[in-house]
């Protein structure tokens, strides 16, 4: 029993170390971009339609959606359109690396709305696909929702926008994922 507990503790410790290793704060990410570190690719993994309504940071090198919205499929149980994983996600990331002359060992930083639904899973998928230095922005672009009070439900707690980092309601046509030109 004692050996089982020790093994479980070691396993938990390694999971905790992995979680720390894979996540970056918005401020840490911005500092890397400001230093113009040559071996970094910063990608926004949100659907371009979400970016159009929520905002975009031009600090991002490219928009490569991890999940896409299928507006022909309605999920009645959740009251939303169906989301599906972008089947070309890994190949599109490879293309962005190649455009910048970067290898699979480059630090790839992904950012979604909150960090947990697409940011972390996209970084994990990239690691599984041979990109050992994939990471994600903890709390993402909008951050967490406030739990209580008159602003309950609003994403005003943390994340890129709420950290005072640069963003705009406008998209950069040269960086956004577009099916008409790419």
Regions inferred by a protein language model and the residue ranges of each:
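Positively charged n-region of N-terminal signal peptides that target proteins for export
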Residues: 1-4
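Short helix-onset patch at the extreme N-terminus, typifying the N->h transition
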Residues: 6-9, 74
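Hydrophobic h-region of N-terminal signal peptides that target proteins for export
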Residues: 8-18
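Rhodanese-like catalytic fold shared by cysteine-dependent sulfurtransferases
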Residues: 18-38, 48, 52-107, 117-182
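Structural scaffold elements adjacent to functional motifs in cytosolic proteins
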Residues: 42-44
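Short, surface-exposed ligand- or partner-binding patches at beta-edge/loop junctions that are enriched
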Residues: 111-112
